[in-house]
């Protein structure tokens, strides 16, 4: 049985992994943000855009009901944004995730949860832990990709 501390720990991990993604982006020259290599089809810029959209969609639209509308296809096709913009957007998305956790009604944590795209989860806590692992996966890809660009 999960409680608010489980959710808070998951969001702490989200912030930690997002911090690692920010470090990776900051370490790249501007012209390498959108480069691919090592057989990874997505650039670090694209991975960051995807994570930004994911956090805004599930925490912003899903939990906060803030009206965010995800354009998932653009996360993979919209390239050429500046490094500063990509970093700013990712930082803002992490803040949305943190705000969402603060807004969660503790009584909802162990109840079944339907995501904004209609997927059913056994609980809101499980869904948030899943979001943390999704972020970790893509940050790992980005970490690997920095060695190839």
Model-derived segments and spans:
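Short, helix-capping/interhelical loops that line the mouth of catalytic, cofactor-
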Residues: 1-9, 53-103, 107-119, 148-149
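Short, contiguous alpha-helical
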Residues: 11-15, 22, 30-74, 115-149
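Hydrophobic alpha-helical core bundles mediating ligand binding, dimerization, or RNAP-core interactions
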Residues: 14, 18, 25, 90, ...
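Short, flexible helix-adjacent loops and helix caps
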Residues: 29-33, 106-109
């Amino acid at each position: 049985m999960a409680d608010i501390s489980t959710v808070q720990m998951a969001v702490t991990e989200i912030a930690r992994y997002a911090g690692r993604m920010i470090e990776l982006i900051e370490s790249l020259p501007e012209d390498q943000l959108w480069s691919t290599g090592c057989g990874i089809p997505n650039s670090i810029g694209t991975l960051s855009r995807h994570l930004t959209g994911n956090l805004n969609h599930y925490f912003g639209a899903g939990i906060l009901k803030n009206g965010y509308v995800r354009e998932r296809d653009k996360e993979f096709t919209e390239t050429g944004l500046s490094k500063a913009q990509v970093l700013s957007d990712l930082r803002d998305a992490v803040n949305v995730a943190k705000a969402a956790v603060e807004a969660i009604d503790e009584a909802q944590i162990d109840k079944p949860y339907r995501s904004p795209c209609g997927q059913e989860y056994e609980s809101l806590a499980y869904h948030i832990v899943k979001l943390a692992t999704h972020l970790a996966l893509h940050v790992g890809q980005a970490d690997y990709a920095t060695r190839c660009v």
